C-alpha cells in the first residue's frame, strides 16, 4: 500500500508534465508551457482521484504468516521499512493513444531517472561547472605552492579556480539541432575575505568568457552526426590531471571547427582558430599585436585491441603579419615571429576492473618547444604568460607522458603521472637561446579504499631538470613532496569521480633552485602545510 501511495503521489506531481510535454510544440515560451501545465494538472487530478479509488477497492489486506528474511550477509532485513527513507522507483505517466483503454492500462511506468532526463531534454538547458576551494596554513607563514606541474597538486595548491558553462538548445527539428554555449572561467582569491573582480591585488581575482559559440548537428550532409561549431571556442583539451597542465591545448579568440566526424574506424576533430599574440621588443617594455592562426587536426578513437584506442594529432601555428610589424622586427628590436608546430600520438588502455592508462608521445619546435621545457607548467602554449619573445631558431623538444589509475585488489588504487622530456637548441625562458634541457617528473598516489565514500593515502612527487645554456653552463632544479591525505568521495575512482573533500598534511622541499631561485617564507627551502580542500564538477 505504501508503494501505491508513493506512486499515486508521484502521479499527481509528474503526470501532467509528461502529458503536456507530448502535446506542446517547442515553439511555446516557458510562460505558456507553465500555464498549460497548471491547466493540465487541474484536469488530471479528478481523473487520478477516480483511478486511486479504484485501486484502493482492488487492494484487500491479507494476513500472511512469514518468517523474517535475511540479506546476503546474514543480517535481518527490516520487514517494516519507514516511509521517510524511501522514494518511488518509478512514476506513472498517462498514455495518449486513443486505443489505450482497449489494449490495457491508460498509464505506463517510467523511472524517475528517465523522467528527469525527459524533462531536461524538453527544456533543452544545462548548467555544468567545476571549482575548487579550501583552507591551508603552513609552518612559515602563508602557504606557498611550488612546482605543481612537476610535484603534483594534492596539498600544493591554494587557488580557487572555477569553470561555469551554460548551454541552451534553440532548435531541434527535422534532424537538425542548434545549441548556444557560453563558458566563464577564472579564479576567486583564497587569501583575503574580499575578492572583488578588478581589485586584483596579488593577481588572484579574475574572470573571462573563455567560450561563446554556436554548435550544430545535421547541417553538414557529409557529417550529419558531427558537431559543427562557430565562435569563440578551441579544440578539446587533454589534461595531465595530477599535474594540472595540458598535453593538448589550443586557445582561441574565435574559430570554426568540426568534432566527432566519423571517418573510417575513428573520428576526426578539426579546428581553425585565431589567437593573436603580443610580440615584445628586447627590453620587454614595448609590444605590438600580431595576428596568428592555428589549425588543429586530430584523428581519435581508433580501435586497436580490446579496450585500447589510438589518437594521432597535429597542430600548426602561423602569423599573418603586416608590413609595419615586420619592419619593427627588422629595425626596431622586436622579436621575430617563427611559425611553430606540434605533432604526436596517444594510446589509451582501459582495464577490466576499472581504471585506465594513457601514454602519449609529442614533438614540437620553436615556441611550443620552449613550453615543453617549463618545469612548473608545461601546456603547449605559443607564448609565456601571454607574451611572445625569444630568439627561436628551429630547435625541437620531445615529451613522453603516462597518466592513469589502476585498482589492486578490492581495497587499493594507485594513480600515476610520469613525464620525461628533453630539448635541443630551444629558447628557454630561464637560460635563453640555444639551450638544451632534460627533465623527469613522477607523481604516484596510492590509497586504501575503506568504502565507496572514504580513502586514505599518500601522494609522492619528485622531479629533476637540468638546463644547459649556449655557453654550456648547467642549471639544476629539483625537489620532492610528500602528502598524507584522507578523502570523502562519492565513488572509488581518483581521477574520474567528484565531488571530493580532502584533508591533507604536506611536506615539500626544494633541493635545487638554480632556474627560478624560489624560496618559501623566511627564505626557507622547505614547507610543512596542513589544510582541507573541496573539488567538484557537475
Swiss-Prot record:
It is a multi-pass membrane protein. The keyword Membrane applies. The keyword Glycosyltransferase does not apply. Keywords: Cell outer membrane, Ion transport, Membrane, Porin, Signal, Transmembrane, Transmembrane beta strand, Transport. GO terms for biological process: monoatomic ion transport; polysaccharide transport. CDD domains: Maltoporin-like. One of its GO terms (molecular function) is porin activity. InterPro entries: G_neg_Bact_CarbUptk_Porin (IPR050286), LamB-type_porin_N_dom (IPR021570), Porin_LamB (IPR003192), Porin_LamB_sf (IPR036998). It is found in: Cell outer membrane. Belongs to the porin LamB (TC 1.B.3) family. This is Putative outer membrane porin BglH. It comes from Shigella sonnei (strain Ss046).
